[in-house]
């Protein structure tokens, strides 16, 4: 069996929603979670500057850890440069996290779907290509929130969420027109599932919320060699790397719940 680790990458701790699902399918693998929290949030970065930063980080990561596969657990990075990563590192398997627009278009009954994302994901050409390819017959509302990813990070650090502000961020997702209304909202940021119970509480009406984490987990498992013997005991511990030194006690507790040992202040030579 290939004993190389599976690497997860995000700007913060939102990608833990994806790690949780992948780990449930292949618990025997070693997982390395990388959070470039110095760069958080990625949604407001200038594109070329962010691309250069990510490429430098991955040049370092892949040299040091030689993973079997990398999960880009960040919609902003995936929609911006998954093709660039595959081209630069052709020997590495990459699984991206992109808006589940195809699935939403297949499941909507009203034809009205919304994509709740970051500003970066909303403006990406990749996102609009997904809509044109799979949801051309649908009314697709793109909503780029500048605040929700930060709300999720703060919530996971034990801080309270301003529900009125959260409600204002999701209100544009709820569209009524010609007797029809939104029936599906795509969560297009890996941070957002951590806020899902708040979204449901503040929703204007009942909708289906699509979290792509399970689909990403299945895709990841399909790309890795299947174990011959049903090994479930890890040989190596999982761990997390953070680029900042500022890891709060609540974040440490969260990572402990995910059985991740922490190394902070990692310098990726960016």
UniProtKB/Swiss-Prot annotation:
GO-annotated molecular function: glutamate racemase activity
Protein origin, superkingdom: Bacteria
Active site per database record: 74, 189
Pathway where it operates: Cell wall biogenesis; peptidoglycan biosynthesis
UniProt EC number: 5.1.1.3
UniProt entry keywords in alphabetical sequence: Cell shape, Cell wall biogenesis/degradation, Isomerase, Peptidoglycan synthesis
Pfam families attached to this UniProt entry: Asp_Glu_race
Function: Provides the (R)-glutamate required for cell wall biosynthesis.
Protein name in the entry: Glutamate racemase
Native source species: Bartonella henselae (strain ATCC 49882 / DSM 28221 / CCUG 30454 / Houston 1) (Rochalimaea henselae)
Gene (UniProt): murI
